[in-house]
Amino acid sequence: MSLIRKKGFYKQDVNKXXXELXKTYVSPTHVGSGAYGSVCSAIDKRSGEKVAIKKLSRPFQSEIFAKRAYRELLLLKHMQHENVIGLLDVFTPASSLRNFHDFYLVMXFMQTDLQKIMXMEFSEEKIQYLVYQMLKGLKYIHSAGVVHRDLKPGNLAVNEDCELKILDFGLARHADAEMTGYVVTRWYRAPEVILSWMHYNQTVDIWSVGCIMAEMLTGKTLFKGKDYLDQLTQILKVTGVPGTEFVQKLNDXAAKSYIQSLPQTPRKDFTQLFPRASPQAADLLEKMLELDVDKRLTAAQALTHPFFEPFRDPEEETEAQQPFDDSLEHEKLTVDEWKQHIYKEIVNFSPIARKDSRRRXGXKL
């Protein structure tokens, strides 16, 4: 089969992996690679801006890989908020569907992520600003009907101006059981996700924000469980062992009898648990690290907490204009059918001017 290539592309090895990039993007430099693909940075000749280019590894290897690739493309395309990573461009060197095997996602380049800088000592002002941005991003994602489910420091990208963007949202639902080589980080996960003990809603992500904020305050992972049971034990040491009202909501009979077998204990005093935290920070943490999903704050409610008063701008707390369309989510399609859908999206893609914050916080990492 002859591989006819489009004009305007060039081949280059980036960290021993062959990349075929549009000529608009120059000076590719390897950034990292993982189970799902590799990322390089490059300069967009048109704007002079640095971008991140992600090449998915073997997107059409199986139905699961192809479906995940389609979902990632659509999610990135849908999200248009300054605190959520979105799609600047998408391209393929293939000139037709027949020779379409790879595609590249272009996003804003961010210097680092929270995991890499967790050892820093964060001032309360920095914590306010970073957590405020996490919640703004989550309010937007949730308003589109998407739940992150796997929020952790490693998928919160930040730059030197303390601007934050949420990565890898909405992909976790496929990742756990189906993708090999994927390790679930349970430390930041809400107990109802780890244990499937009760219905869950969008506040699973708020629990994760609570864990991340606590770690920024103390420099230590809050709940570092060795396994699922140890994770639950560590959580209950902080939240207290809940009473009958909570236990009645549990769907899982084993979880129910386990909780009932434990002596009831009160919640720890958060001002003592987090001596560095201001009373408002401790109060917010207490409301985010709430075992009962019906009582836990939503992102929109958390944004109104007095802790964020110095940075709050309700005009920036926007919602998605329409819900994310996952109508193909439940379809059983072949690899070739997913491929057609993806190719069509790439061919029809037109970049949207992405707005960034109207103001600068003045905070530096």
UniProtKB/Swiss-Prot annotation:
The keyword Transcription applies. Activated by phosphorylation on threonine and tyrosine by dual specificity kinases, MAP2K3/MKK3, MAP2K6/MKK6, MAP2K4/MKK4 and MAP2K7/MKK7. Activation by ultraviolet radiation, hyperosmotic shock, anisomycin or by TNF-alpha is mediated by MAP2K3/MKK3. Inhibited by dual specificity phosphatase DUSP1. Coiled coil: none annotated. It comes from the Eukaryota. Keywords: ATP-binding, Cell cycle, Kinase, Nucleotide-binding, Phosphoprotein, Serine/threonine-protein kinase, Stress response, Transcription, Transcription regulation, Transferase. The modification Phosphotyrosine is found at Y182. One of its GO terms (cellular component) is nucleus. The modification Phosphoserine is found at S47, S350. A motif (TXY) lies at residues 180-182. The modification Phosphothreonine is found at T180. ATP binds at V31, G32, S33, G34, A35, Y36, G37, S38, V39, K54. It holds the Pfam family Pkinase. Dually phosphorylated on Thr-180 and Tyr-182 by MAP2K3/MKK3, MAP2K4/MKK4, MAP2K6/MKK6 and MAP2K7/MKK7, which activates the enzyme. Dephosphorylated by dual specificity phosphatase DUSP1. It catalyses: L-seryl-[protein] + ATP = O-phospho-L-seryl-[protein] + ADP + H(+); L-threonyl-[protein] + ATP = O-phospho-L-threonyl-[protein] + ADP + H(+). GO terms for molecular function: ATP binding; MAP kinase activity; protein serine kinase activity; protein serine/threonine kinase activity. The TXY motif contains the threonine and tyrosine residues whose phosphorylation activates the MAP kinases. Serine/threonine kinase which acts as an essential component of the MAP kinase signal transduction pathway. MAPK13 is one of the four p38 MAPKs which play an important role in the cascades of cellular responses evoked by extracellular stimuli such as pro-inflammatory cytokines or physical stress leading to direct activation of transcription factors such as ELK1 and ATF2. Accordingly, p38 MAPKs phosphorylate a broad range of proteins and it has been estimated that they may have approximately 200 to 300 substrates each. MAPK13 is one of the less studied p38 MAPK isoforms. Belongs to the protein kinase superfamily. CMGC Ser/Thr protein kinase family. MAP kinase subfamily. This is Mitogen-activated protein kinase 13. It comes from Pan troglodytes (Chimpanzee).
